[in-house]
């Protein structure tokens, strides 16, 4: 789970207006709300909104978006990628091939080991302008037919293909975030 410190370090400075009418937003909210879990932080008024299809633990492969509600409004959309395997990669960059277009991101990766010799590496990035993970990147994945990712490590690499379910989950989260009034910001 993301720490409050991580969110606090990524304060937006400029908002972008979204093209959702009130009626479209209400219809989208009714459509997407059942696809998500909401977990309230007992020490603040933060509510974590995560797709029901997202892995519950770090020691699982996964890719998804989620966001936090604060004061009843959605806060920065986030992109999470989790790698779980037998071999360390020490991921330094990731190349996403989205319907034939390559987009490179330089994620801020965390690593851990355990679980009978297995390892896991993950990134959790704010979706904001000025980052390599911005709204255009998420929109491309959300509307893609095919997404492959090459994780370039310090000595090795691995490739994965996003499933149709993972792509749909990113699209659902993106649309739900916008329907709730979520804004994309510049840092």
Q: Positions of the model-derived regions?
A:
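A generic "folded-domain core" signal
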Residues: 2-187
């Amino acid at each position: 789970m993301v720490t409050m410190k991580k969110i606090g370090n990524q304060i937006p400075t400029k908002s972008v207006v979204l093209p959702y009418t009130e009626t479209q937003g209400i219809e989208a909210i009714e459509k997407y709300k059942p696809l998500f879990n909401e977990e309230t932080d007992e020490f603040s008024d933060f509510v974590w909104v995560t797709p029901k299809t997202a892995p519950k633990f770090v020691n699982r492969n996964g890719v998804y978006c989620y966001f936090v509600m604060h004061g009843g409004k959605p806060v920065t959309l986030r992109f999470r990628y989790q790698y779980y395997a037998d071999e360390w990669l020490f991921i330094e960059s990731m190349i996403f091939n989205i319907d034939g277009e390559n987009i490179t991101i330089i994620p801020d990766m965390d690593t851990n080991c355990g679980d009978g010799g297995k390892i896991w590496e993950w990134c959790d990035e704010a979706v904001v302008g000025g980052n390599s993970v911005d709204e255009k990147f998420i929109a491309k994945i959300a509307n893609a037919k095919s997404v492959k990712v090459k994780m370039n490590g310090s000595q090795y690499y691995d490739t994965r293909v996003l499933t149709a379910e993972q792509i749909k989950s990113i699209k659902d989260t993106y649309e739900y975030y916008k329907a709730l009034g979520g804004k994309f910001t510049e840092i």
